[in-house]
Structure formats: structure tokens, C-alpha cells
């Protein structure tokens, strides 16, 4: 029997949340620190399953690091070049896309023999476009089970050169190539085919590479030029900003049942595109205030919206449950890549929204939500997807309780989410 957590109806949310570190930034920073020359102190690192998978992999590859007791500060001794394994090695990466994709690329630089594998869901998450691009650059990669999916066997050989990669499935493929290319022997030119999804995540990658001493030129995110034979250099210390996707639940809760909630660790200067989530809440009618290192949200009369949310794919999920509290329908468009995340999020979201009484239209790349007059108490399936669990906690901001099945799945990015949510909540 799955564990479950029942949230009783909440009358008001109010308070401040210091956000855990960003998953996207933490795993990129850990990998660059490992590749860099010098020692890097990373502060406000996220402590979650996805990060532990990256740390375990780096340790197996001979990287020395020291973690503080609460695992949020990590001092990494960089190797000043590529990661190599002296003997054949198998690395288990759970369901961490932010570890699997970049490591698949970076580990093609040497001539090590390395297998990358993970949980059953990881074996359903496509990686073929990345493998194709790496092979264009000379990498030797074999699929061990299903063509185009992990597990992979890597045997090095990547030298750079002219690469093309499909931009339509995941921006992590491009992120992986960008982080790898400076260490290749040759200069690299990467051409993007199709529209690049989740562009703001590429900005995170470019920002981090710059922090570690490497500039990348690009032509309108369609062609990227990277010089080969470079070395990443430690910035000394690097502060990981708060996780903007994680902020979305607290900001949405305030929009629905504030009070006022302030999230700290992100703000005007944030490198994460998911901070744009606050603009969507504002469009719906919430009151939003921005500081340099905080965003604050207060309740407003929420109206449904119809919007392309390709630029905030993770935080957009939170809009789907916020829509339950708006007047009129909400349509979230251009989110095909929800289908290749931790689960097929479009189908999962449609299924669970219907359980609480919403009328839902699920398209190939959009979802339309018509809120019910009265929400229905339901047991919410979470599909081993941290964001499903967190999104549906918002249902309790009504006069109806909600039961979340397998609440511990939030450990992927936010182990103490439900404690933080409860801390802000005053029960009806």
C-alpha cells in the first residue's frame, strides 16, 4: 500500500519561505566545479535525490568533495580537465535528467568505458538526439537496451566539430553539448534544428559556464560557437540561487488564499526562467512584488488565461492546479515536452484534475482546464513525479481536503516540501 498524506482545508497562507537551492543550477555547478581548475565552494546547494545521484557519480569518477552537515555547502576539488575512469564503470543516475544528459556528453571526452543507467522511468526518457549529436563529434556510444533510450555504454572519442541537434524535445541535450564542447580538442559549432524548447534553461547553462570562465557566442539561439582546448576555472565560491520551480507552489498558494507569501533566494536578478511564473500569476489577477532576492505574492480575484508556457515548462504545471481557483477556463499551450519528463505530465495532470471535478481537454501539446463549482475530495496519484505531488497540494486551499499518494516523491527536488507548506498554512 502506498503511503499517503491528507491535507485538510486551508483558510489562509502567510509567511516567508527560504527556498532550497535550484536543482538545475546545483547539478550544473557541481559538474563544472568537478571539471574546473581549482577548488570551488558551492553554497545553497540543493539536498535532494537528483543531486545525490550527481554527487555519487562524481565520487565514483574520482572527484573529491566535502559536504557540510546539512549537505547544502559543497567544496569541490576540480580535476582541471575531463573526468576519466581507470577501469570500466557503471553509474546509476536514478531519474535525474540533469545528471544523465550532461554526464552522457562529458564522459565522451576521454576513452573510458562507462555505462550510464537509472530507474525504469529513466529508460523511457529519450536521449537519442543527444547521442546522435555526440556521434557526429566522434563519440562511441551504444544503446544497451532500447534504441534512443538509456542505459548507454560510452567509450569516449568525442572531439568536437560540426554538430546538429534537435531542439524540440529537451533543452538538456543542448546544455550537455555546450558544457562539454570547451574541453574537446577541436572547435565546435552546434546548429539547432527546429524550435529550441525551454530557452531560459540554456541561459542558466551559459550563465554558469561564464561563472567558470568560459564565454559562448550564439546567433539567436540557433547556432552556437565554442572554442576547443579550453579549461574551466573555479570562481572560488558560487551561490546557488533558490529553486524558482519550487517557489511556484508557495506563490500560487498566496495568489489563491493569501495573506502574503514571500519567497527568498530568487528575485529580479535571477538566472532562472521559471521566475516568470510570477508574471503569469499577476496576469491572472494576483498582486506581485519583486525584490533583488525575493518575490512576494498576495491574493487577487483570479481569472483564467490562455497562454503559451513553453518558456516555463516546470512551473506551468502549477498554473494547471491554480486554474481550479480562477473564474473561467485556463489553457496552457506549447507544452509537448511535459510528455517526456518524470512522467507523461499532460496525461497525468488531466487524469488527476478530472478526479477533483475539473472539466479537462488534453491536446497533444496543450491542456484546457475548466474549474468546477465545487472541488471533490480525491486520492491523487503522483506517478513518482515530485511536481504532481506539490501541484495538487494546492487543492487543499479550498473547503475540500485532498489526499496525496506517495508524498515522499518530492524528495527528487524538495524533501521537506509538505513541512514548509504546512508552516505557512492556517487550517480552516
UniProtKB/Swiss-Prot annotation:
3-phosphoshikimate binds at residues 23-24, 28, 170-172, 198, 314, 337, 341. Phosphoenolpyruvate binds at residues 23, 97, 125, 172, 345, 387, 412. Keywords: Amino-acid biosynthesis, Aromatic amino acid biosynthesis, Cytoplasm, Transferase. Pfam families: EPSP_synthase. Its EC number is 2.5.1.19. Pathway: Metabolic intermediate biosynthesis; chorismate biosynthesis; chorismate from D-erythrose 4-phosphate and phosphoenolpyruvate: step 6/7. GO terms for cellular component: cytoplasm. One of its GO terms (biological process) is aromatic amino acid family biosynthetic process. One of its GO terms (molecular function) is 3-phosphoshikimate 1-carboxyvinyltransferase activity. It is an enzyme of class 2 (transferase). It catalyses: 3-phosphoshikimate + phosphoenolpyruvate = 5-O-(1-carboxyvinyl)-3-phosphoshikimate + phosphate. The keyword Zinc-finger does not apply. It is found in: Cytoplasm. The active site is at residue 314. Belongs to the EPSP synthase family. Monomer. Catalyzes the transfer of the enolpyruvyl moiety of phosphoenolpyruvate (PEP) to the 5-hydroxyl of shikimate-3-phosphate (S3P) to produce enolpyruvyl shikimate-3-phosphate and inorganic phosphate. This is 3-phosphoshikimate 1-carboxyvinyltransferase. The gene is aroA.
